[in-house]
């Protein structure tokens, strides 16, 4: 249960997000069956969120907080750190495990 992080390509190994910092990421979100539900890459616009402010689902924030600058990783988020039993109607089914391909581009 929780978030599992699998490195696709390593970052600098030194610069990690701190509480209050803004993470600038590119991501693609998928269901376990591979169906894409969202992607900042498709919009060609990086996504920004502040660490510690619950602006994203818990698993996404927990995973990104453990990534170093420049790292690209696969985050597998179980329902307890995603959208849970409710899901997100029309997009995320109830009790769905979500997979994110996340690249930490910058910290502000």
UniProtKB/Swiss-Prot annotation:
Keywords: Cytoplasm, Isomerase, Rotamase, Sarcoplasmic reticulum
Annotated tissue distribution: Detected in heart muscle (at protein level). Ubiquitous.
GO biological-process terms attached to the record: calcium-mediated signaling; insulin secretion; insulin secretion involved in cellular response to glucose stimulus; negative regulation of calcium-mediated signaling; negative regulation of heart rate; negative regulation of insulin secretion involved in cellular response to glucose stimulus; negative regulation of release of sequestered calcium ion into cytosol; neuronal action potential propagation
Main location: cytoplasm
Official protein name in the record: Peptidyl-prolyl cis-trans isomerase FKBP1B
Disulfide bonds: none
Regulation: Inhibited by both FK506 and rapamycin.
GO molecular function, one term: calcium channel inhibitor activity
Family: Belongs to the FKBP-type PPIase family. FKBP1 subfamily.
Subunit (UniProt): Identified in a complex composed of RYR2, FKBP1B, PKA catalytic subunit, PRKAR2A, AKAP6, and the protein phosphatases PP2A and PP1. Interacts directly with RYR2.
PROSITE patterns, per the entry: FKBP_PPIASE
GO cellular component entries: calcium channel complex; cytoplasm; membrane; sarcoplasmic reticulum; sarcoplasmic reticulum membrane; Z disc
Chain ranges of the PPIase FKBP-type domain: 20-108
Role played: Has the potential to contribute to the immunosuppressive and toxic effects of FK506 and rapamycin. PPIases accelerate the folding of proteins. It catalyzes the cis-trans isomerization of proline imidic peptide bonds in oligopeptides.
Catalyzed chemical reaction(s): [protein]-peptidylproline (omega=180) = [protein]-peptidylproline (omega=0)
Subcellular location: Cytoplasm; Sarcoplasmic reticulum
Species assigned in the record: Rattus norvegicus (Rat)
E.C. number: 5.2.1.8
């Amino acid at each position: 249960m929780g978030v599992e992080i699998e490195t696709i390509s390593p970052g600098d190994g030194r610069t990690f997000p701190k509480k209050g910092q803004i993470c600038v990421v590119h991501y693609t979100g998928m269901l376990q069956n591979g169906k894409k539900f969202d992607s900042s890459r498709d919009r060609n616009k990086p996504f920004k969120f502040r660490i510690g402010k619950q602006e994203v689902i818990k698993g996404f924030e927990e995973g990104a907080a453990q990534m170093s600058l420049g790292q690209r990783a696969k985050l597998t988020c179980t329902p307890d750190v995603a959208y849970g039993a409710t899901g997100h109607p029309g997009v995320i089914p109830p009790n769905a495990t979500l997979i994110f391909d996340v690249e930490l581009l910058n910290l502000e």
